[in-house]
Regions:
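N-terminal flexible/basic segments that precede or flank functional cores
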Residues: 1-39
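Short, charged recognition helix plus adjacent turn
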Residues: 3-4, 43-46, 90-98
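Long, contiguous binding/interaction regions
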Residues: 57, 76, 97-98
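DNA major-groove recognition helix of helix-turn-helix
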Residues: 67
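The DNA-recognition helices of helix-turn-helix-type DNA-binding domains
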Residues: 70-71
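DNA major-groove recognition helix of helix-turn-helix/homeodomain DNA-binding modules
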Residues: 74-92
């Protein structure tokens, strides 16, 4: 029986938009920029960094830097990346907020 590397399996699962959305939302809920950037990088890898760079007109090397744990993309770049992934940012009221 063939075994699948965890990272390879994750990249396959992240090709599902529903799974990718849940994955990114969980990373956001962690409250850590590093965790979110790692998750966004995983989702981007599932689509292909080169493909996203081509669609967004962002330099591939810059994409890797932006999507690193210490990456700090500006809002415009983040929007372009998410748009290329078929996703968008949304602001919602917290359930327990007054």
């Amino acid at each position: 029986m063939a075994t699948v590397n965890y990272n390879d399996g994750l990249l396959v699962r992240l090709q599902s938009p529903e799974y990718a959305i849940e994955y990114l939302n969980e990373a956001l809920n962690e409250g850590s920029q590093e965790v979110f950037m790692m998750a966004l990088r995983d989702v981007a890898k599932a689509k292909g960094i080169s493909q996203i760079a081509k669609e967004t007109n962002l330099n591939r090397e810059s994409m890797y830097r932006m999507l690193s744990e210490k990456g700090n993309p500006n809002l415009s770049s983040l929007h372009q990346i998410l748009n290329s992934l078929g996703l968008t940012l949304a602001i919602e009221k917290k359930e327990n907020a007054a």
